[in-house]
Amino acid sequence: MLKNFILVTLRNLRRNTLYSVINISGLSIGIACSILILLWVQDETSFDKSIPKVNKIHQVWVNAHFDNSIQSWNSVPLPTYTEMKGAHAKIVNSVVTGWGGARLIALDDQRIMKDGYFASKEFLDVFEFPMLVGDRSTVLDDPSSIVISEELAKVLFKDEDPGGKFLKVDDTSTLQVTGIFKDIPDNSSFQFDYLIPWQHRVATEQWVRNNTTNWGNYSFQVFLELNGDADQLEVEESIKGMLMEKGQDDIERIFFLH
């Protein structure tokens, strides 16, 4: 019976070649599009899901009111980082980071460009990226430390234990490896192969030191971890006027959480 069905199908295909090609092509395109849409939806819904507390973490943004328009920025003044810690009882922690970028990482005669971040010591506690070596709560405590990815550790150290070894960054800073984290998934907002303590940046970059208490320079990223039962709108209400209180210009600028 199956053989007869196949023979009949083949005869119909030969008899109506053009019609069959159109139908088969349409079906193939439809299936391909459905698979692509399914993969896209799967990627979108799984984005940042590797971060255990993703629903509790919010980035601080600014709405700036100019005449008849509102501009939204995800860059904020540096003192936002410290001021947020006591701004509301439901704010568990705050984190400040740079914007990332490639730097030259060197070990002896090995030199490689890798992307990474300057990040405050709370970063790994808040985002909870899995650690292979080191305690996430302390690996960024020392300003002269560096935490690297599993991949970067393998590239530079092969099978050797990198713990306590030193790396040269941009031919200017010598930093000690204090931890190794698992490679970051592709569907993560953060993509990096190393973390350098924020205090190292403060110590080595004059312009960062100059902006520690400056509310007029919007050059930094700040993230907040909220308590599990926190009402985001309630927290926003308590912090939205901070810029107007601290700033010195007449432009209305309001904090909100994204």
Q: What residue ranges belong to the model's regions?
A:
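Membrane-helix entry/capping segments
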Residues: 1-11, 15-19, 51-52, 236-258
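Structural preference for long, well-ordered alpha-helical segments in enzyme cores
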Residues: 9, 24, 28, 40, ...
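Short, strongly hydrophobic transmembrane alpha-helices
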Residues: 16-43
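Membrane-proximal extracellular/periplasmic loop immediately following the first transmembrane helix
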Residues: 37-102, 210-211, 215-227, 234-238, ...
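Short acidic/polar micro-motifs at solvent-exposed secondary-structure junctions
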Residues: 62-73, 96-122, 132-146, 170-172, ...
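Mid-to-C-terminal secondary-structure elements
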Residues: 120-133, 146-258
